[in-house]
């Protein structure tokens, strides 16, 4: 079942959490209720790392990561980077992103195999992301939207994309990633699904305003089932 979260009174929980198959990063001052909800769902199988990034609580916006690697902005402090290095699994490769773009989480949607990138990212940045995360990167837009990470979220099971996408663009997503996609919303009608959903291949969290119909769609497309 998808779990609802309310972080800092906001429903855009993807701004504040990075969840992968091997680690979870949350801000230092996350309240104990939300921390315990996340910890309970992770069931001690995934380490939770509490840190800010660039002195900001928006760790989900500022980081890009999966179980193989983590990319941090060039504005990260020495102390913050050391916190990550001390608590991340040893196999996770950490590299600094040197372009003057800090909202990395808005520019890329990815799982363990593929990354969908905003055309605003340079080729050298895409190559860095590909090397660190071990994914194939493809540049595209979602209709007229360039902020791929804001309007798309997917894992190894399937994905949600903003609902105003053409059939051709939808079919391209399926062909590129090899997973099913569905147009949908989160938080009672918001199309920024990449900000309202946090997931890995086994768990899905969503913003607290997400209604039952939206949760049903998210569960069906993003959660593992015996039929997939």
From Swiss-Prot:
HAMAP family per record: eIF_6
Signal peptide: none
InterPro entries: eIF6 (IPR002769)
Protein name: Eukaryotic translation initiation factor 6
NCBIfam families (alphabetical): eIF-6
UniProt entry keywords in alphabetical sequence: Cytoplasm, Initiation factor, Nucleus, Protein biosynthesis, Ribosome biogenesis
Stated family: Belongs to the eIF-6 family.
GO MF term set: ribosomal large subunit binding; translation initiation factor activity
Localization annotation: Cytoplasm; Nucleus, Nucleolus
Primary role: Binds to the 60S ribosomal subunit and prevents its association with the 40S ribosomal subunit to form the 80S initiation complex in the cytoplasm. May also be involved in ribosome biogenesis.
SMART domains referenced in this protein's UniProt entry, alphabetically: eIF6
Cellular component annotations (GO), alphabetically ordered: cytoplasm; nucleolus
GO biological process, one term: cytosolic ribosome assembly
Lineage: Eukaryota, Cryptophyceae, Pyrenomonadales, Geminigeraceae, Guillardia
Known partners and oligomeric status: Monomer. Associates with the 60S ribosomal subunit.
Keyword flag Transport: no
A Pfam family annotated for this UniProt entry: eIF-6
